[in-house]
């Protein structure tokens, strides 16, 4: 999810704005056949969950999914009717960075953790 909101990512600007405007309870886990996915809450996820709760058949759910695609959200920018996959961390993303800056931030955060672990694992 973090890399969707980078300058280099080709995701539609509406998607980036949707993630930037997200809060800590903005995602929902949805079951699609035998696996779960996590999406940004929107009209699509609400309707999909309502259909599941009402006992919609796999065929009905598939037809719905075919009309509400990731392409619709990520490329066309329809962040309400398209499926917008993202992780639980979406609400923690609050800036548009370059991919290089994201990597630099990850490294800067992990180096002290590695150093602390290394000091605890040292053999006398």
Regions found by a protein language model. Name each.
Residues 2-124:
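Conserved active-site-proximal phosphate/metal-binding subdomains
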């Amino acid at each position: 999810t973090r890399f969707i909101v980078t300058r280099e990512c080709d995701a539609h600007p509406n998607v980036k704005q949707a993630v930037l405007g997200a809060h800590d309870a903005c995602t929902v886990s949805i079951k699609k056949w035998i696996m779960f996915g996590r999406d940004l809450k929107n009209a699509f996820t609400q309707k999909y969950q309502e259909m599941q709760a009402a006992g919609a058949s796999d065929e009905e759910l598939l037809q719905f999914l075919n009309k509400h695609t990731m392409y619709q959200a990520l490329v066309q920018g329809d962040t309400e009717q398209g499926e917008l996959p993202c992780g639980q961390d979406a609400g923690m993303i609050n800036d548009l960075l370059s991919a290089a800056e994201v990597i630099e931030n990850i490294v800067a955060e992990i180096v002290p953790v590695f150093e602390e672990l290394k000091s605890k694992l040292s053999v006398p």
